[in-house]
Structure formats: C-alpha cells, structure tokens
UniProtKB/Swiss-Prot annotation:
Sequence ranges of Low complexity compositional bias: 58-70
Phenotype seen when the gene is deleted: Inhibited growth under dark-light cycles. Altered PxcA- and PxcL-dependent H(+) efflux/influx activities under fluctuating light conditions; prolonged light-induced H(+) extrusion followed by slightly decreased H(+) influx activity until light-to-dark shift. The double mutants missing both PxcA and FlpA or PxcL and FlpA have both reduced light-induced H(+) extrusion and later lower H(+) uptake activity.
Broad class of the protein's primary localization: membrane
Recorded topology in the membrane: Multi-pass membrane protein
Its job: Essential for photosynthetic growth under fluctuating light by modulating PxcA- and PxcL-dependent intracellular pH regulation via proton transport (e.g. transient pH reduction upon transition from dark to light followed by an increase in the light until light-to-dark shift).
Family, similarity comment: Belongs to the FLAP family.
A cellular-component GO term for this protein: plasma membrane-derived thylakoid membrane
The protein's name: Protein FLAP1 homolog A
Keywords: Cell inner membrane, Cell membrane, Membrane, Thylakoid, Transmembrane, Transmembrane helix
Amino acid sequence: MLKMLKNLPLPKNITWRSVWMRGTSVVIIFVLAFTLVFTPTFEAEARRSGGRIGGGSFRAPSAPSRSYSGPSGGSYRSGGTYGGGGFGFPFIIPFFGFGGGFGGIFGILVMIAIANVVINAIRNGGGSSGEGGGGLAASSDPQVGIAQIQVGLLASAKELKKELDELALSADTGTANGRSLVLQEATLALLRHPEYWVYGSSQSDKVRLSAAEAAFNQLALTERSKFTDETLSNFNNQLRQGGRATAIGGDSPDAVPDGAGEYILVTIIAAALGNLNLPAVNDSSQLKQSLQTLGGISSDRLLAIEVLWTPQEEGDTLTSNDIISEYPELRLV
C-alpha cells in the first residue's frame, strides 16, 4: 500500500514528507482539542467539597474585682483622741509608761520596734501590690490550649457523614453551650464508628490568649484551603448551603458507588482555656483517647471549635493519593 501511495503523482512543490508532516500536525491538534474539551470533566470528578460547623469568641475572661475595706470599729477616726490620726500609736506608748516608771530608754526601744513593724508593713504592702498586678496581667492574658484531631474513614461510613450534615443544619453555633454540644456530638459520631477508622493524627499546643485566635485561625484556614468548595457551612449561626446536594444525607444523581471515593476525612480543631494535652496517635486506642479528651472539654473552658469534613457532597471523592499529598501527618490506625 505504501509503495502504491509513493507512486501516486503529486503536484509540483509537494513532497510526501510535507504531506506526512501536515498529517501529523492535524493529529496533534485533534488530541489537544480532545484534551481541552474533556479535562474539565475530569477535574469535576476530582472535586472535593467540604462541610463546616463552628464558631467561637476569644474574649478575655472577666477578672474578679479587687476591693479594699477600711479598718472597722473607728480605731483611726475616733474624735481627736489621737491628735492627727496616722497610725494611732501614741496611745500605746503611755501604756508602757513612756516618761514614767519604765524610763526613757525602754520607750525609745518600743518606738524603734514599732517603726520597724510599720516599715515592713509598707514594704510588704508594696510587694503584694506588685504581685497582684502581675497576677492581674496573667489573668487578663491566660494560657490557651489549641488541639487538632484528624480521622480518615472508609467512604462507606455514610451514616457518619449524614450525622455531620444534620448537625450542621441544627446546631446552635452562636452560644457557648451550643458549640460545646457540637464538639460532643462530633466526637461521639467518630467514637461510634471505629470500624471505619483507617487513619488518625493529633496535635496540641499552648499559647497566650492574645495569640490564640491567630493560631486557631491559621490551623482552620490550612484545612479549609484543601476543599475546592464549602457546600455546607454553619459558622456562628450563619448557615450556608450550596452545590449539587438535593437532600442532606440523601443520594444525588451523581452519587458514586460505595468505596469509589475511598475515604472521608474529618478534622476537629478546638481552643480552650488551660492545657489541652493529646496523646500522639499511632493506633486506634490512642485515637480513641484523644477523641474522648477533646470531647470532654467543658463549655466554660471552650473558646472556639471547627468541625470540618470532606467530601460533603455525594459524587465527590477523596482518594488515597489525596490522603498522601494533602494529609501527610496521618498515621494508619
């Protein structure tokens, strides 16, 4: 066939080589066009939607008021008995017989002793005042613990995802008690499904209250940036929904079979007054302990909470490659 083609007459100034080059160019253009047309579809299939529940406030706790009650009984204000007020010591000196039977030397010694007591009292008062000032400074900028737990579960844990979706729709994230309930329910949802656990990690740190909000937001933004879109969000009682989901917990027309997405990743970030010491996660028992510790934070200590999960919508995927590239700190449990 090639010999026959080569024997075919060609117009002048046209060679078989030029024909071959032009044909190759056409094929390349066709391949590029095909790639441009179908690449968005592939990207849509790799879309990672995310859900978010949370809120909080990093206000300093109110410090107890410091009050000073004056001496009772009128010891220093009873008429003109003490001549000009002050500490009122003149009445002590006659008692010891100043200028009388005990002689002047003993009275001088008593005066020196009293002066020493007064000086020490003034010094101690100044020292305690300074210490009180330091205590006030510490109480106005107390220590805050910030902790994060991440759990990678099999994609077949649809009941867990449904619980998180429903929690996002019903949670009161604008109050301390409501946020405490979110933390408890999210940790309970994970603790109830250990059969789906595959990966886990935990980290905790402590900072002063003045730096806590920035540290907390940095952690939250790092995790939220891994989503292509937040399709369900309830933050500080601001509820937002979007995307393809037709019903919370229901199947959408684009739903994929169980296991096709491979994983669900849940992140819980909390900030609380005091220490938050979580054990390093190397197995399922340590992951369980970390979840129980985090879920046990009382509402009066909890400052802020973020519960994040991906994928949120049916049809979106989180593959093993995504886990390796986006969540390298995770460990098999």
